[in-house]
Curated annotation (Swiss-Prot):
Species of origin: Ralstonia nicotianae (strain ATCC BAA-1114 / GMI1000) (Ralstonia solanacearum)
InterPro entries associated with the record: NRAMP_fam
Main location: membrane
Lineage: Bacteria, Pseudomonadati, Pseudomonadota, Betaproteobacteria, Burkholderiales
Biological role stated in the UniProt entry: H(+)-stimulated, divalent metal cation uptake system.
GO MF: cadmium ion transmembrane transporter activity; manganese ion transmembrane transporter activity; metal ion binding; symporter activity
Keyword vocabulary terms for this entry: Cell inner membrane, Cell membrane, Ion transport, Membrane, Plasmid, Symport, Transmembrane, Transmembrane helix, Transport
GO terms (BP aspect): iron ion transmembrane transport
Official protein name in the record: Divalent metal cation transporter MntH
Chain's gene name: mntH
Domain of life per record: Bacteria
Family annotation (NCBIfam families): nramp, Nramp_1, PRK00701.1
Membrane-topology annotation of the record: Multi-pass membrane protein
Record-annotated membrane-spanning stretches: 67-87, 141-163, 173-193, 216-236, 264-284, 302-322, 357-377, 379-399, 420-440
Length: 442
């Protein structure tokens, strides 16, 4: 059987799964609230993937075209993501292995290689969205040409190198700071634009009438596809193992509960950010007659004159930059997890980062060079289509494994959880395949 050669093990950042496993101690005699604080963190790293520029594009278009009416789709998509991420975390805590490694152990080599390639493709697609978002942020904030901004994003490998010697908790703190930056920017934006909050609250109630036409249904599926990230399912099952958990059933049950709370709180932050983007677009654009804003550049261009202050545009750019940079770390971690889990292969983290970014830079450069600055919107759509296509291949083994009593024991999915999970699999798979077909059909 062909095996990839092992490469030198030279860690340069706290990203290699086997090196950070069990690095955060949680003494059993700690008070519950201190245990919760020690356990908080993995959910934050996962939540970053739910705030990438692909989400921005779909939320902005939904808000500008249909006002607040699709806000409930953001809510339901986030709830679906919470269910799947809780399953992923439980798998990692109970088995002590991540989804990629378990897939390697339980499936045939050919199927494992296909899974690995598809998962790597999803990371590159996500990184493409980050490249475009950061390049656009450099353009909006500093006036750098889009192509120049794309080139600047290659320097984020230096950020990974700069984390040499940092521990995993410091990495989580950095990501938390970036998430808070995004949240603060949108808090100020909403304070400036002053949306109609009763209408916002009413839009949280599901309204199937809002999806009766083809166009809002298309956008709703786009929101769903942009919200649930496939590589996050691999990521979460691994990084929860940074917490030291006793192998006794009560200790694992407590860890599962703490992880569930961490996941819900962290993804609620992502929900607030995505909801704020849609609400801002609805209040600033839809309410003022600009119902054709379909990309991030147009949103930034119109925001300042509508709000009446240059601060609005600056905050928008800062939040976009923070969203792109925060995913630098999680993309690198997820890549290491895939290589170590599927292939038993470890390489220096900066090399891993450089390889992923190089693959993402190629379509970004070609697209912008050939189609101009407005290619960003099209490329973001393509990145979300790729992510949507890969998602079922990550969901299926996750749901199947967490429902396997031989593997999970008493922690296996109950009937209700299994029913909800398989329904989500069916709905998300059909929705994403329909979205892929619509995009390919033009």
């Amino acid at each position: 059987m062909f095996r990839l050669p092992a490469l030198p093990r030279i860690p340069t950042a706290p990203f290699c799964p086997s090196e950070v496993r069990g690095c955060v101690a949680i003494p059993p005699d700690l008070p519950l609230w201190k245990k919760l604080l020690r356990f908080a963190g993995p959910g934050l790293l996962v939540s970053v993937g739910y705030m990438d520029p692909g989400n921005w594009a779909t939320d902005i278009e939904a808000g500008s075209r249909y006002g607040y009416s699709l806000l409930f789709v953001v809510l339901l998509s986030s709830l679906a993501a919470m269910v799947l991420q809780c399953l992923s975390a439980r798998l990692g805590i109970v088995t002590g292995k991540d989804l990629a490694r378990l897939s390697r152990e339980r499936y045939r080599p050919g199927a494992v290689r296909v899974q690995w390639l598809l998962a790597e493709l999803s990371i590159v697609a996500c990184d493409l969205a980050e490249v475009l978002g950061c390049a656009l942020a450099f353009h909006l904030l500093l006036g750098v040409p889009i192509l120049g901004g794309v080139a600047l994003t290659a320097l984020d490998t230096l950020i990974v190198l700069g984390l040499k010697g940092k521990n995993f908790r410091q990495l989580e703190a950095i990501v938390l700071g970036l998430i808070l930056t995004i949240g603060l920017c949108y808090f100020v934006e909403l304070a400036l634009i002053r949306p109609h909050w009763p209408s916002v609250a009413g839009a949280l109630v599901p309204s199937w009438q809002a999806l009766s036409a083809r166009e809002p249904l298309y956008l709703a599926i786009g929101i769903l596809g942009a919200t649930v990230m496939p590589h996050n399912l691999y990521l979460h099952s691994s990084i929860v193992q940074t917490r030291v958990v006793s192998e006794t059933e009560p200790a694992r049950r407590e860890a599962v509960g703490l992880s569930r709370l961490d996941t819900i709180v962290s993804l609620s932050l992502a929900l607030l950010v995505n909801g704020a983007i849609l609400v801002l677009a609805a209040a600033a654009f839809h309410a003022n007659g600009h119902q054709d804003v379909a990309d991030i550049q147009d949103a930034h261009r119109l925001l300042e004159p509508i709000v009446g202050t240059a601060v609005a545009g600056v905050l928008f750019g800062i939040a976009l930059l923070a969203a792109g940079q925060s995913s630098t770390f999680t993309g690198t971690i997820a890549g290491q997890i895939l290589m170590e889990g599927f292939l038993e292969l470890r390489i220096p983290c900066w090399q891993r980062r450089l390889a992923t970014r190089a693959l993402a830079l190629i379509p970004a450069f070609v697209g912008v060079a050939m189609l101009g600055d407005h290619a960003i919107g099209r490329l973001l759509v393509i990145s979300q289509v790729v992510l949507g296509f890969q998602l079922p291949f990550a969901m299926f083994p996750l749901i199947r494994m967490t429902g396997d009593r031989a593997l999970m024991g008493t922690f296996a999915n109950g009937r209700l959880t299994s029913a909800v999970a398989w329904c989500l699999f069916a709905v998300i798979s059909v929705a994403n395949l329909w979205l892929v077909w619509q995009v390919l059909a033009g």
